[in-house]
């Protein structure tokens, strides 16, 4: 489990500044069930099952997932039952 911090670039008085956007928890899991082309059930490495959706870049590049695929999931600390799939392992 690893914590990642995303930064958002904003302009204030003509100067670009970075602002913390969100801290996420990154975990590895296995796709167990496919609800639609974008919604999945993922079993995490700590034996917790969550619902997850495909990130925008994955759907843009038509990356398909099937049950049994190993994936990286980012989870917000505010809602630990919903995640975003950001990478599919080969």
Swiss-Prot record:
Gene3D superfamilies: Nucleic acid-binding proteins (2.40.50.140). The keyword Metal-binding does not apply. Keywords: Cytoplasm, Initiation factor, Protein biosynthesis, RNA-binding, rRNA-binding. GO terms for cellular component: cytosol. One of the essential components for the initiation of protein synthesis. Stabilizes the binding of IF-2 and IF-3 on the 30S subunit to which N-formylmethionyl-tRNA(fMet) subsequently binds. Helps modulate mRNA selection, yielding the 30S pre-initiation complex (PIC). Upon addition of the 50S ribosomal subunit IF-1, IF-2 and IF-3 are released leaving the mature 70S translation initiation complex. Component of the 30S ribosomal translation pre-initiation complex which assembles on the 30S ribosome in the order IF-2 and IF-3, IF-1 and N-formylmethionyl-tRNA(fMet); mRNA recruitment can occur at any time during PIC assembly. This is Translation initiation factor IF-1.
């Amino acid at each position: 489990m690893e914590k990642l911090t995303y930064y958002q670039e904003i302009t204030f008085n003509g100067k670009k500044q970075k602002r913390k956007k969100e801290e996420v928890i990154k975990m590895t899991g296995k796709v167990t069930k496919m609800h639609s082309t974008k919604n999945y059930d993922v079993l995490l490495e700590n034996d917790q099952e969550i619902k997850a959706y495909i990130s925008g870049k994955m759907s843009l590049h038509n990356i398909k997932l099937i049950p049994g695929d190993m994936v990286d999931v980012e989870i917000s600390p505010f809602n630990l039952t919903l995640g975003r799939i950001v990478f599919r392992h080969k």
